[in-house]
Amino acid sequence: MNMKKKEKHAIRKKSIGVASVLVGTLIGFGLLSSKEADASENSVTQSDSASNESKSNDSSSVSAAPKTDDTNVSDTKTSSNTNNGETSVAQNPAQQETTQSALTNATTEETPVTGEATTATNQANTPATTQSSNTNAEELVNQTSNETTSNDTNTVSSVNSPQNSTNAENVSTTQDTSTEATPSNNESAPQSTDASNKDVVNQAVNTSAPRMRAFSLSAVAADAPAAGKDITNQLTNVTVGIDSGDTVYPHQAGYVKLNYGFSVPNSAVKGDTFKITVPKELNLNGVTSTAKVPPIMAGDQVLANGVIDSDGNVIYTFTDYVDTKENVTANITMPAYIDPENVTKTGNVTLTTGIGSTTANKTVLVDYEKYGKFYNLSIKGTIDQIDKTNNTYRQTIYVNPSGDNVIAPVLTGNLKPNTDSNALIDQQNTSIKVYKVDNAADLSESYFVNPENFEDVTNSVNITFPNPNQYKVEFNTPDDQITTPYIVVVNGHIDPNSKGDLALRSTLYGYDSRFVWRSMSWDNEVAFNNGSGSGDGIDKPVVPEQPDEPGEIEPIPEDSDSDPGSDSGSDSNSDSGSDSGSDSTSDSGSDSASDSDSASDSDSASDSDSASDSDSASDSDSASDSDSASDSDSASDSDSASDSDSDNDSDSDSDSDSDSDSDSDSDSDSDSDSDSDSDSDSDSDSDSDSDSDSDSDSDSDSDSDSDSDSDSDSDSDSDSDSDSDSDSDSDSDSDSDSDSDSDSDSDSNSDSDSDSDSDSDSDSDSDSDSDSDSDSDSDSDSDSASDSDSDSDSDSDSDSDSDSDSDSDSDSDSDSDSDSDSDSESDSDSESDSDSDSDSDSDSDSDSDSASDSDSGSDSDSSSDSDSESDSNSDSESGSNNNVVPPNSPKNGTNASNKNEAKDSKEPLPDTGSEDEANTSLIWGLLASIGSLLLFRRKKENKDKK
């Protein structure tokens, strides 16, 4: 970074200047020779100029030769970041502090170095150069006291006070000798504060150079005039506005917003001030004990700091930001509250505010609302002061403001039930004062109380703390009744460690004219306005449930968050509503709060349309033991469009006893596109008793790619009684790759009546590798009526090892009407070991039309041991037209035989006699016997192995 430092010096046009230079030169030579003498100056300006040299242990000092021409250096504002356009300055609502630091004019090519406005800020190593003028006597000479070193820091403290007082500066020094300087008539004395800004700057100056001397500014600061001037009437483009409703409810957190805008003249310098007039009907603190106004921020830099004077107006003081900027504009928004001391009654109030000659006014209705009343009991309270520094609050309660006759009155105060109130109510933290009001008309509706106007009867009442966080006031009168109002002022403490808000409940007990014991309560809370940190109270009348027994006071449990409403009820003739809103573009350093009543009635209706596209990856280990009894009537009409990619790895151990009685009427249109990769280990033990009536009308279009690796161990006892009426149109395109190891032990008792009408169009490519071990006991009673039209195109590649041990007892009546059109290509490699005991009683009536086109290649090793007892009645009607061409006969009849006679005569002719047919039968019989023996032997070996 290219650091640029500029020093500007002004030449005083006085004859004494040359003499001063000569005297200073001689004294300088003397100091260089002895290094013991201190420089002596009668001019504050020369001392200040010397003290503004930058001294840092990490960098060398930069000095500049004084200019010899008559150019007025104060006319030029040096800042590398200043452009000719208008600079808009907006208030920063988050900045609450109002102190300012020392001025620095050192700039770089990237950002100007300006003073920051923070509380108790320590700054070090800040090089500064002087800027003075030979004609303007109002220049800030105190800029010259901004020298810092790497070893010392500046401590900035803020004193906010409404009085116009000026505090002197104390400058510490590391030398033992200090001289008090007196300003000349032609020079401005150093001044870091003005009459409106109460900032006190304590600076530590390290004077290690031999020609630098330390001096005190206490006398100078005490006698110096104000550094800045009032430029209120020089501001341009001034706008003023009052933002509020036509009615303001002070006890419902009601407030008004004051808006201001203006342009700052380019001639403004640090220390200049302007004033905003605030109407006496408003204050800027609400219920907080102190008030602050927001600083005007330019980004992270402070443009002006504000204080409140003794008249309640706001005085802003410009910082050194305006020294390096032009065309500066600013906007201010402040929340303001109805002042209870100046506006004590409900009525119309005209508010007037402004800057200089530009003003705005608005007439609003101030409505304090009325107290709560129940029969002859009346009460109202407000929290009218909060001190967050000392953690204290003040609550003012009107008891019997209606002036009715209340017999045996008792007032209790405690934390509001069901809230996290931070109030501390006990004898050590709570002080109570009671005042008697002779005339109800003397009560102010704003709850402003001047104790001097009322009779203090605190010593005449009985004040106790019977329960934790509860006080009790008994009004001891000669006739044990009251007919005039009373004011109870509670000064309490807040728990600083609590995160809750201040919330209190006051309850008045007493007998009515019919000697019925009744009670009436009033709640007080505090609400803070957005952005400003100030607020107003929320007041709401509450009529609790009435006590059951005469003289009974509701107990307060140890837990202050519980609701002691067992003896409380609500019946009120008062209606309380709240219109509260906050819109703030300003941030105020003030801590302001107010006391308000709030009642809310809300009806909410929500209409939501939702569409979901989900990618899900799930890894789940689930163990479930569930006993479920469900009786459900469900009517569902659902249109669902789902696009889901799911990767599911699930280990599930489920033991479920389910008794389900379900009537379901479902009309579903589903369009599903699913890619599923599933790896599942399942161990299921299920006892299921299901009685289901299902009426399903389903149109399904499914495109599924499935890769499944499944190990299944299933032990299932199933008793199913199912009536199913299914009308299904299915279009399925399935590619399946299945590797399955299955061990199944199933006892099935099935009674099924099935009426099925199915149109199926199936295109299937199947690659199956199956190892099957099956032990099945089947008892089947089946009545089947089947009407099937089948069109099958099948390519089958089968490699099968089969070991079958079957005992079959079959009684079958079959009536089959079959039209079959089969086109089959079969490549079979089969090894068969069969041991079969067959007892067959078959009545067969077959009417078969068969058209077969078969290409068969068979490699068969067969070993058969068969005991067969057959009783067969066969009625076969077959029409066959076969044209068989022997292997050695010519394709073209006799003509071909004549042409190839010589060739054919060399080949032996086939035997056609009866003797050859007998020989052929004998050969085949021997082969069959041998094969049977081999098969029987192999079967026996297999049984021995088992």
Swiss-Prot record:
<feature type="compositionally biased region" description="Polar residues">
    <location>
        <begin position="71"/>
        <end position="111"/>
    </location>
</feature>
<feature type="compositionally biased region" description="Basic and acidic residues">
    <location>
        <begin position="900"/>
        <end position="909"/>
    </location>
</feature>
<dbReference type="Pfam" id="PF00746">
    <property type="entry name" value="Gram_pos_anchor"/>
</dbReference>
<dbReference type="GO" id="GO:0005576">
    <property type="term" value="C:extracellular region"/>
</dbReference>
<dbReference type="Pfam" id="PF17961">
    <property type="entry name" value="Big_8"/>
</dbReference>
<feature type="short sequence motif" description="LPXTG sorting signal">
    <location>
        <begin position="909"/>
        <end position="913"/>
    </location>
</feature>
<feature type="compositionally biased region" description="Low complexity">
    <location>
        <begin position="47"/>
        <end position="65"/>
    </location>
</feature>
<dbReference type="InterPro" id="IPR041171">
    <property type="entry name" value="SDR_Ig"/>
</dbReference>
<keyword id="KW-0964">Secreted</keyword>
<feature type="compositionally biased region" description="Polar residues">
    <location>
        <begin position="162"/>
        <end position="199"/>
    </location>
</feature>
<dbReference type="Pfam" id="PF04650">
    <property type="entry name" value="YSIRK_signal"/>
</dbReference>
<dbReference type="InterPro" id="IPR019931">
    <property type="entry name" value="LPXTG_anchor"/>
</dbReference>
<feature type="propeptide" description="Removed by sortase">
    <location>
        <begin position="913"/>
        <end position="946"/>
    </location>
</feature>
<feature type="region of interest" description="Ligand binding A region">
    <location>
        <begin position="40"/>
        <end position="542"/>
    </location>
</feature>
<feature type="compositionally biased region" description="Acidic residues">
    <location>
        <begin position="598"/>
        <end position="874"/>
    </location>
</feature>
<feature type="short sequence motif" description="YSIRK-G/S signaling motif">
    <location>
        <begin position="9"/>
        <end position="20"/>
    </location>
</feature>
<dbReference type="InterPro" id="IPR011266">
    <property type="entry name" value="Adhesin_Fg-bd_dom_2"/>
</dbReference>
<dbReference type="InterPro" id="IPR005877">
    <property type="entry name" value="YSIRK_signal_dom"/>
</dbReference>
<feature type="compositionally biased region" description="Low complexity">
    <location>
        <begin position="565"/>
        <end position="597"/>
    </location>
</feature>
<dbReference type="Pfam" id="PF10425">
    <property type="entry name" value="SdrG_C_C"/>
</dbReference>
<dbReference type="InterPro" id="IPR050972">
    <property type="entry name" value="SDr-like"/>
</dbReference>
<dbReference type="InterPro" id="IPR011252">
    <property type="entry name" value="Fibrogen-bd_dom1"/>
</dbReference>
<dbReference type="InterPro" id="IPR008966">
    <property type="entry name" value="Adhesion_dom_sf"/>
</dbReference>
<protein>
    <recommendedName>
        <fullName>Clumping factor A</fullName>
    </recommendedName>
</protein>
<keyword id="KW-0572">Peptidoglycan-anchor</keyword>
<keyword id="KW-0732">Signal</keyword>
<feature type="modified residue" description="Pentaglycyl murein peptidoglycan amidated threonine">
    <location>
        <position position="912"/>
    </location>
</feature>
<keyword id="KW-0134">Cell wall</keyword>
<keyword id="KW-0843">Virulence</keyword>
<feature type="compositionally biased region" description="Low complexity">
    <location>
        <begin position="875"/>
        <end position="893"/>
    </location>
</feature>
<feature type="compositionally biased region" description="Low complexity">
    <location>
        <begin position="142"/>
        <end position="161"/>
    </location>
</feature>
<feature type="compositionally biased region" description="Low complexity">
    <location>
        <begin position="117"/>
        <end position="131"/>
    </location>
</feature>
<feature type="region of interest" description="Disordered">
    <location>
        <begin position="528"/>
        <end position="917"/>
    </location>
</feature>
<comment type="function">
    <text>Cell surface-associated protein implicated in virulence. Promotes bacterial attachment exclusively to the gamma-chain of human fibrinogen. Induces formation of bacterial clumps.</text>
</comment>
<feature type="compositionally biased region" description="Acidic residues">
    <location>
        <begin position="546"/>
        <end position="564"/>
    </location>
</feature>
<feature type="signal peptide">
    <location>
        <begin position="1"/>
        <end position="39"/>
    </location>
</feature>
<feature type="region of interest" description="Disordered">
    <location>
        <begin position="34"/>
        <end position="199"/>
    </location>
</feature>
<dbReference type="GO" id="GO:0007155">
    <property type="term" value="P:cell adhesion"/>
</dbReference>
<comment type="similarity">
    <text>Belongs to the serine-aspartate repeat-containing protein (SDr) family.</text>
</comment>
